[in-house]
Structures are given as C-alpha cells and as structure tokens.
Amino acid sequence: MKRRIIAALLFFCVISAVYAETDYVKMLKDVDELVTFKGTDLSAEYTIVKRDPDGSSSTTVAAMFRRDSEDKFVVLVLQPVADKGKGYLKQGNNLWLYDPIGKGFTFTSAKERFQNSSFRVSDFTGSNYAGNYKINNVKQEKLGKFSCTVFDLEAITKSVSFPKVKIWVSEDNLVRKLEDYSLSGQLMRTSAFPSYQKVGKRWVPAKIIIQDHLVFRKVGDKVEYERTTVDIKNPSLNKQPDSLYTKEYLERVNTK
C-alpha cells in the first residue's frame, strides 16, 4: 500500500512538471506573438542615441520596414548626414549592408552592432524565444510595479545574437527587462523596456534603454557604462510595396 502511494505521488509530480513546462513554453509563444506581425507589414522611425562612458554621444535616425510573414526587413539610415542612405536588407537568412558611397552590397550578420551602438541589427526583428531557446529555469520575481515570470533561456540555434538570455515577463506577456549573456555566463548587456505602444492587436516598444557591460570606464569607485536609448515613433501597419524589400529599392532611394 505504501509503495502504491509513493508511486502515485511520483506520477503526480512528473505529470505536474510536464504540464508546468508546457504552460511556460506556451507563455513564451504568447510573448513572441504579441510583438510579431505576421498578417501585415510594420514600419516605424527609430531614434538611437548612444552615450559613451566619457560623456560624448551620437544620434542615428532610421526608417524600419518589416514583413514578418516573409522574414524580411529593410532599415534605411536617415541621419547623420554622413551615413544617410546606408541600408540593411534582410531576406530570410540573408542580410546585406548597402554602402551608398561605394554603391555596393556586402553580406553582414544580424549580430553586428547597429551604427556602433549597443543596439544590434537583430533587435529590429520580433522575438522568437520559443523557437530559438530552451527553458533552463523559471521563477517569479517583482520588478518595480510588475509581477514577473523570469525565464533563464539557452539557445538551441547558432543564429541568435546571444547564446543565453534572461527575460522578465509581466502578467500581460510583455518583456520588461532583458539580460544577454555569453556562453560562459558573462553578462553582455542589459535592456529595459519602460513603455510599449499598441499597434493594431500587437505591441511595439516605445522606448528601450540598453546598458553595454563590455564598454565602460572606471572613475574612482564608479563605473560608467555605454548606454544606448532607442525611441520608436510613428509605427504603422500600412502595407508596403513588394519592391521595397529589394536591393533595387536601396539603390533607387539613394539616387533621389
């Protein structure tokens, strides 16, 4: 009788763990779905301000166009004037950088820094945590006013920018904080998402604040890190012409 009770308890624990894991995977899928625009195009204007540890700063303004259903995006630099016309084109697994001065395309990686800031080219896309990562650990934690589920995730594909990440997900399934780690566990950068804006039935961050833990300066006992602030404005779901997601578009827009 005692053995039957123990066996039943073990069975219950296993079943409960399986259901819990399934629920967390579904939660990650819901997180991804809220920021992915499969049924329409998405466009927006990005203002990216990088502040170096020495206090100097630089600003980039870019127009972004996404078609998630076809895994495509175009990013066109509008400012500064010296970089105006520089652009990125993503078509599936292929990503090109267009140089308006040399009038040529080169293959590049979504892992690269955008305009030498802490913002990566991959940050222009929606998230795919459920498809690119496995769950190592889950816990509940308070983050300011938000009650969050904290996921420790490890990549199952080499295409992601960071092999390990930790995300704080609030009860509305929006990511409020993100920590990116190297494979060895070194903290690379921390991102905060203080506000979102609703676009149709989905959400786009209104502001992202990124702290780069690899670029810093020590002043006495204080450490100053590189800090990048991203403001996303004028999001639109207007359908863009198919010709926009092509090399010809980036070439043509630079002749105007």
Which functions belong to the PLM regions below?
Residues 21-33, 37-40, 47, 56, ...:
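Flexible, processing/modification-adjacent segments and terminal tails
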Residues 66-68, 89-91, 98, 169, ...:
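Generic beta-strand structural signal
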Residues 42-74, 78-81:
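N-terminal, post-signal-peptide region of Sec/Tat-exported proteins
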Residues 5-14:
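Sec-dependent N-terminal signal peptides
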Residues 15-20:
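Sec/Tat signal peptide C-region and signal peptidase I cleavage site
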Residues 1-2:
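N-terminal secretory signal peptides that target proteins for export/translocation
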Residues 31, 62-66, 192-198:
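Extended lipid/amphipathic-ligand handling interfaces
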Residues 108, 146-247:
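Gly/Pro-enriched, hydrophobic low-complexity segments
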